[in-house]
């Protein structure tokens, strides 16, 4: 019984990473850019129908909804070899095509105007699935469409489908270089409020670190968007392998999320991946045993979120899920886990068990790989709060001077006052406090004092 997942791609960033994700899925399942199963793809043990459905003529169509308020990226997808892959009815471009101008308020209020058209598409897609498990939303939090329209959709999805899971892949802005979006801290904070309140699970893709990894580890001088998006699609496809190549564990989304998120608000996950290579043809001369892979996943340099050093707080893991792909002997897994615990290679919360789960998954038979074993770590770690602290600091600087607020005042939500900004700041501040509380043994009773 497949539990289907509908992917929603929003804005420039969401559609670009979504495009790479579908390219990767097609390659892994032996599906051509037109959606036709390749001649050599005869192994019937994968589950294509979690992410695809079949048209009348048997070709595969992604369960994806592509939304944007300006046409550039979606047009480039429609002019690519993968143009015929998508269902044209699932592509929504706003009439006037002016975009949201990197303004959260504009994206949000356009969402209010066009939500009926968008939900017609989403409802049709949901009705077409046997037992829909949830939605995956790809977007960035710094721009206008991904953040504003994304926030609006998150709120509405909760109202419309209260029992369905909502997982997001959220791209956080690059802090190493100057942003061309001056209101980025406002956009990010307003979106973070929705990610805290309306999503079940947020996979944080931090552009700062992705750029550093591309430069330092993959030795790319000036990484392009395309190369960064390939890294992202690797993470996205690896995090869904257990759904597509089902084993006896973690073969649905709730199984993945449940082991990682013991308390509902602390649902921001970071990822790590090893071994990282861009060039498939270069076989890296490294031994990849399960222990090597698991040990490397715990090294900070493989983790794809840049967290600041915090001397006051003893940050720790709340839970870890390692998805290991390749030729693995299950007894090795047990030994590796024991060794990680004995050597205390990971520092865990004081109020619960040291939860390291391992999901074994097959590799796609159709893709050549230079490594016997590769691994993805999805970790719930309290230091992710430093990312939110950084956003709050930048927000406070702008808010104190009331900088750039006139762009927001044009929209209905900010006509009267800026309460929405201040409540968002409050929500994110509480989230940071809760992450700090989770590093202390008395966290279990912390919630009770708050109520």
From Swiss-Prot:
GTP binds at residues 142-148. GO terms for cellular component: centrosome; cytoplasm; gamma-tubulin ring complex; mitotic spindle microtubule; nucleus; polar microtubule; spindle. One of its GO terms (molecular function) is microtubule nucleator activity. Phosphorylation at Ser-131 by BRSK1 regulates centrosome duplication, possibly by mediating relocation of gamma-tubulin and its associated proteins from the cytoplasm to the centrosome. Keywords: Cytoplasm, Cytoskeleton, GTP-binding, Microtubule, Nucleotide-binding, Phosphoprotein. It is found in: Cytoplasm, Cytoskeleton, Microtubule organizing center, Centrosome; Cytoplasm, Cytoskeleton, Spindle. The keyword Disulfide bond does not apply. Pfam families: Tubulin, Tubulin_C. PROSITE patterns: TUBULIN. It comes from the Eukaryota. InterPro entries: Gamma_tubulin (IPR002454), Tub_FtsZ_C (IPR008280), Tubulin (IPR000217), Tubulin/FtsZ-like_C (IPR037103), Tubulin/FtsZ_2-layer-sand-dom (IPR018316), Tubulin/FtsZ_GTPase_sf (IPR036525), Tubulin_C (IPR023123), Tubulin_CS (IPR017975). Component of the gamma-tubulin ring complex (gTuRC) consisting of TUBGCP2, TUBGCP3, TUBGCP4, TUBGCP5 and TUBGCP6 and gamma-tubulin TUBG1 or TUBG2. TUBGCP2, TUBGCP3, TUBGCP4, TUBGCP5 and TUBGCP6 assemble in a 5:5:2:1:1 stoichiometry; each is associated with a gamma-tubulin, thereby arranging 14 gamma-tubulins in a helical manner. Gamma-tubulin at the first position is blocked by TUBGCP3 at the last position, allowing 13 protafilaments to grow into a microtubule. Tubulin is the major constituent of microtubules, protein filaments consisting of alpha- and beta-tubulin heterodimers. Gamma-tubulin is a key component of the gamma-tubulin ring complex (gTuRC) which mediates microtubule nucleation. The gTuRC regulates the minus-end nucleation of alpha-beta tubulin heterodimers that grow into microtubule protafilaments, a critical step in centrosome duplication and spindle formation. Belongs to the tubulin family. This is Tubulin gamma-1 chain. It comes from Canis lupus familiaris. The gene is TUBG1.
């Amino acid at each position: 019984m497949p539990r289907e997942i509908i992917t929603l791609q929003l804005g420039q960033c969401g559609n670009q990473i979504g495009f790479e994700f579908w390219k990767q899925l097609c390659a892994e399942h032996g599906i051509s850019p037109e959606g036709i199963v390749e001649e050599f793809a005869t192994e019937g043990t994968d589950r294509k129908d979690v992410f695809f459905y079949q048209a009348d003529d048997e070709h595969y169509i992604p369960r994806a909804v592509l939304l944007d308020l300006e046409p550039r990226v979606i047009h480039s997808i429609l002019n690519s070899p993968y143009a015929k892959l998508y269902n044209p009815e699932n592509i929504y471009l706003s009439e006037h095509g002016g975009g949201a101008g990197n303004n959260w308020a504009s994206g949000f209020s356009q969402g209010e105007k066009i939500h009926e058209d968008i939900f017609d598409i989403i409802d049709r897609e949901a009705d077409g699935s046997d037992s829909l498990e949830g939605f995956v939303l790809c977007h960035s939090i710094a721009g206008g469409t991904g953040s504003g329209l994304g926030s609006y959709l998150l709120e509405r999805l909760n109202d419309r489908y209260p029992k369905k899971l909502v997982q997001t892949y959220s791209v956080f802005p690059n802090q190493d270089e100057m942003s061309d979006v001056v209101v980025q801290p406002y956009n990010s904070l307003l979106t973070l409020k929705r990610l805290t309140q309306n999503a079940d699970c947020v996979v944080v893709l931090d552009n700062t670190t992705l750029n550093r990894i591309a430069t330092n580890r993959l030795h790319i001088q000036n990484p392009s968007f395309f190369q960064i998006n390939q890294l992202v699609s690797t993470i996205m496809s690896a995090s869904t392998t257990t759904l597509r190549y089902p084993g006896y564990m973690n073969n649905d989304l709730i199984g993945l999320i449940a082991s990682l998120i013991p308390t509902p608000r602390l649902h921001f996950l970071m990822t790590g991946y090893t071994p990282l290579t861009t060039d498939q043809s270069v076989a890296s001369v490294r031994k990849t045993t399960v222990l090597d892979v698991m040990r490397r996943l715990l090294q900070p340099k493989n983790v794809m979120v840049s967290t600041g050093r915090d001397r006051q707080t003893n940050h720790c893991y709340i839970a870890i899920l390692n998805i290991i792909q390749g030729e693995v002997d299950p007894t090795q897994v047990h030994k590796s886990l024991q060794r990680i615990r004995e050597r205390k290679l990971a520092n865990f919360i004081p109020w619960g068990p040291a939860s390291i789960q391992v999901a074994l998954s097959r590799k796609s038979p159709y893709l050549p790989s230079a490594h016997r074993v590769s691994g993805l770590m999805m970790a719930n770690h309290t230091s992710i709060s430093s990312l939110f602290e950084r956003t709050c600091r930048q927000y406070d600087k702008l808010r104190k001077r009331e900088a750039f607020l006139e762009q927001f005042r044009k929209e209905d939500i900010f006509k009267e006052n800026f309460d929405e900004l201040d409540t968002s700041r409050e929500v994110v501040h509480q989230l940071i406090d809760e992450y700090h509380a989770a590093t202390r043994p008395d966290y279990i009773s912390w919630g009770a004092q708050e109520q």
